[in-house]
């Protein structure tokens, strides 16, 4: 049997579930929430017509999905060596040879190209922000910082917080204070979220020689960093006062709840893994609740 035939068989075995793994669909979906919220708030706060903005919102979501999925696929291509070492990554199609490198790269660059075309069709700022997100995630995070510094998570938070900016700019064409506030929410959220995950997988990261903060500096140092980011996040809702006092109060309570949960780790004999799991779950719910709340509150202003 020829090598080409074997490779074609490999790619033919990639199903939809495996494709979702390749493009990290869970991560993409999580980022689409703030992207949509950014676009929606731009529609409401700048008095755009919702009906006339629907095509822009859909094109923005489609383009964002493609560039994020393509960047994640490229990340999977680059990380194959360390993924083969980490037990939790063994089911990835890129690890068990369910997709060839050639097809993986074609998928990645194809998605990013089409995604960028979509964003540039909206306006130049959207396309530029998309490019910044791609370069930041692939180059500064995946290729450089992830393998060389414990600041990798913070560095990766910059491109990770771009989606709400793209959403806003797709409608308004320029960045505003509200868009920056949404960016800051996602930016501050990411270290807490990913440090919690890294605590649970610190042995895996150490095995793969990835300098994640818990693996290099230990649990105590990591929880202090998480708490610092929680404190930084606390006043950010004040920047969204134009959504009303009710939103600011509810968002602040959401932040205070997270801080309260974070403080439980300073009790004696607290279970590190259990606490990290609780913080991780809260982080997932936080992002959804925060941005859904922003959308709902903005809807009430239209009634």
Swiss-Prot record:
Q: What highest taxon heads this organism's lineage?
A: Bacteria
Q: In terms of one coarse class, where is the protein primarily found?
A: membrane
Q: Where are the transmembrane segments?
A: 25-45, 54-74, 104-124, 125-145, 151-171, 179-199, 227-247, 248-268, 280-300
How does the record classify its membrane topology?
Answer: Multi-pass membrane protein
The subcellular location is: Cell membrane
In its keyword annotation, does this UniProt entry include Transcription? Answer: no
Q: EC number(s) of the enzyme?
A: 2.5.1.141
What chemistry does it catalyse, as a reaction equation? heme b + (2E,6E)-farnesyl diphosphate + H2O = Fe(II)-heme o + diphosphate
Which UniProt keywords are present, listed alphabetically?
Cell membrane, Heme biosynthesis, Membrane, Transferase, Transmembrane, Transmembrane helix
Single GO MF descriptor: protoheme IX farnesyltransferase activity
A cellular component term from Gene Ontology for this protein is: plasma membrane
Any Pfam family: UbiA
Q: In which pathway does it act?
A: Porphyrin-containing compound metabolism; heme O biosynthesis; heme O from protoheme: step 1/1
Q: How does it assemble?
A: Interacts with CtaA.
**Family the UniProt entry places it in:** Belongs to the UbiA prenyltransferase family. Protoheme IX farnesyltransferase subfamily.
Q: What does this protein do?
A: Converts heme B (protoheme IX) to heme O by substitution of the vinyl group on carbon 2 of heme B porphyrin ring with a hydroxyethyl farnesyl side group.
Q: Any other noteworthy remark?
A: Carbon 2 of the heme B porphyrin ring is defined according to the Fischer nomenclature.
Fetch the HAMAP family from UniProt: CyoE_CtaB
Q: What is this protein called?
A: Protoheme IX farnesyltransferase
Organism in which the protein naturally occurs = Staphylococcus aureus (strain NCTC 8325 / PS 47)
Q: What gene is it encoded by? A: ctaB
